[in-house]
């Protein structure tokens, strides 16, 4: 995905804030691209990345209109290039350097397949979104870029109440968990 962003000539961003976890170095982000940014919040557009085509609109409405006007293009060469990048640059996992985030997420996937995964705020949130392998039976619940430390554990409890037969895995850090550790007692007493 990073290679595709770096090499694309047109980038559609829908409801994205372009925060530093997404963009990296702003001076090097999508250097060849015309950027179209669709967001319902005027303040979010060109806030972090100056865009070429700002669209203030509901994403669903904007996409419906775009699809009415869009012409089908042959993207076979672009798709082939993306597949080459995936093969040439896989997410490498070094097993000779101790435990890595990829290994932890791989272990979570193996132990809890087809589960609901809930993240809190922090680096582990990035690890989960990058390294968990989700399928049609899995679900990822995250607060995104809202910075809501403490979201994970209560959200996991809510997910379990709503889906009592499904495994729910909360991926959190010490700060997020400590903000709501008392809810462990609530979960136990309320079943």
What are these regions (language model features)?
Residues 2, 53-60, 72-83, 95-106, ...:
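Electropositive phosphate-/nucleotide-binding environments in soluble metabolic enzymes
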Residues 3-7, 61, 65-68, 103-110, ...:
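Alpha-helical scaffold segments in soluble metabolic enzymes
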Residues 1-81:
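Glycine-rich, acidic loop regions that bind phosphate or pyrophosphate groups
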Residues 83-159, 165:
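Active-site diphosphate/adenylate-binding microenvironment
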Residues 189-191:
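A glycine-rich helix N-cap at a beta->alpha junction
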Residues 1-36, 135-165, 178-182:
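Glycine-rich, anion-gripping cofactor-binding loops and their flanking helix/strand elements
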Residues 10, 116, 167-169:
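Structural motif
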């Amino acid at each position: 995905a990073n290679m595709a962003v770096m090499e694309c000539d047109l980038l559609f961003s829908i409801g994205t804030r372009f925060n530093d976890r997404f963009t990296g170095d702003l001076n090097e982000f999508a250097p060849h691209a015309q950027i179209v940014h669709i967001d319902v919040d005027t303040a979010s557009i060109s806030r972090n990345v100056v865009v070429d085509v700002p669209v203030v609109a509901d994403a669903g409405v904007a996409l419906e209109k775009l699809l009415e006007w869009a012409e089908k293009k042959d993207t076979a060469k672009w798709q082939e290039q993306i597949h080459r990048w995936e093969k040439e640059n896989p997410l490498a996992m070094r097993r000779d350097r101790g435990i890595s985030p990829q290994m932890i997420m791989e272990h979570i996937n193996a132990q809890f397949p087809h589960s609901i995964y809930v993240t809190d705020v922090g680096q582990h949130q990035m690890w989960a979104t990058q390294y968990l392998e989700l399928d049609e039976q899995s679900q990822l619940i995250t607060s995104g870029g809202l910075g809501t430390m403490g979201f994970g554990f209560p959200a996991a409890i809510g997910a379990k109440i709503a889906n009592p037969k499904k495994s729910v895995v909360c991926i959190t850090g010490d700060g997020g968990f400590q903000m709501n550790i008392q809810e462990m007692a609530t979960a136990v007493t309320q079943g």
